[in-house]
Amino acid sequence: CERIAREKFVPANRASDVEEPWFDGERVHLPASSHAAAEAYFESGMLAAAQDAGMGGMQLPCVVEMAANSFFAKAGIGIGGGGMLTSGNANLLMAHGTAAQKEAFARHEFSGRFAGTMCLSEPQAGSSLSDIATRAVPDGADFERDPLGPRYRLTGHK
């Protein structure tokens, strides 16, 4: 972990400071070193280190996984932060998701194929919960019958 952080994340962190991400109207582009760092991280298996072998993990104690991942956060939180969010998302599914959700989503998050995210944006609301404008409404008459869980449409700031 320390070697990957030093050799891949540190240079990518600096490159990201110098060469900012940019949007071409369809996709966001990052420096090539960001992709190389993320790929090295995913290949290391540390994203799933505390998971069972059946989920692609190493069955390490959670505290060992957290300590190892601290190298990545220290070397470049902009790149390492994505792993933390993805791991948190996948762990939530492991604790509360159905078997189908775990297979469809968590497995791919732990491998690095999918990424989890945290979307928090209610700029007008601040800490006033009554000012939150985002709404979730059922998506179709059979929204609860989807094997991956109920579907909702979100409107407002996301």
Go through each PLM region and give its residues.
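Short, mixed-charge aromatic SLiMs
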Residues: 25-33, 95, 111-117
